């Protein structure tokens, strides 16, 4: 069932066109994306059900294929649509930090790292490797772990930085819990990495911790 049987001013698509996408709820945006419901469940009811089932849009958009297909009425076609939408959003966020471009602002860096790391259900430690003019050489996800943490090996980080001929690096990792507050272990690791890279004249500019809707800079906190 579609939304065509609703009063015109209550249909999500018409409300979007009249008032803008920002005026719609998460469920209404999802209903437009889904287009149709399932047998016995109109599209808005399905959208609300999915928001509840996955605890919000973030949970839905980052669900694994197995989790997604466990929900009645969702198939591989819808899963492919979700993945395509996620990748398009990620590429838009990536545009300010393409290879060879200089870092324009801390805000661009935050947005880029959030788009890359903010949706993982497990911890990922990454590096943004830069040349001596702070132009992007490469973004690399260096270590992956569990929901509780990822093991990081300074020797491997130094090797990768030298291989990329980097002059500076910005580190980042996500907290799957959603709380971006850096731990004492995060601070200690940053200082160890800074010391190890300093031996080969590579500067550590920052280490950012990515939560849900929040990014904390250890450099801004004076914790480097």
Swiss-Prot record:
InterPro entries: MPN, RadC_JAB, RuvA_2-like, UPF0758, UPF0758_CS, UPF0758_N. Pfam families: RadC, UPF0758_N. Keywords: Hydrolase, Metal-binding, Metalloprotease, Protease, Zinc. GO terms for molecular function: metal ion binding; metallopeptidase activity. The keyword Transmembrane helix does not apply. Residues 102-224 form the MPN domain. Transmembrane segments: none annotated. Gene3D superfamilies: Cytidine Deaminase, domain 2. SUPFAM superfamilies: JAB1/MPN domain, RuvA domain 2-like. The keyword Magnesium does not apply. CDD domains: MPN_DUF2466 (cd08071). GO terms for biological process: proteolysis. A motif (JAMM motif) lies at residues 173-186. It comes from the Bacteria. Belongs to the UPF0758 family. PANTHER family: DNA REPAIR PROTEIN RADC, UPF0758 PROTEIN YEES-RELATED. This is UPF0758 protein Maqu_3564. It comes from Marinobacter nauticus (strain ATCC 700491 / DSM 11845 / VT8) (Marinobacter aquaeolei). The lineage of its organism: Bacteria, Pseudomonadati, Pseudomonadota, Gammaproteobacteria, Pseudomonadales.
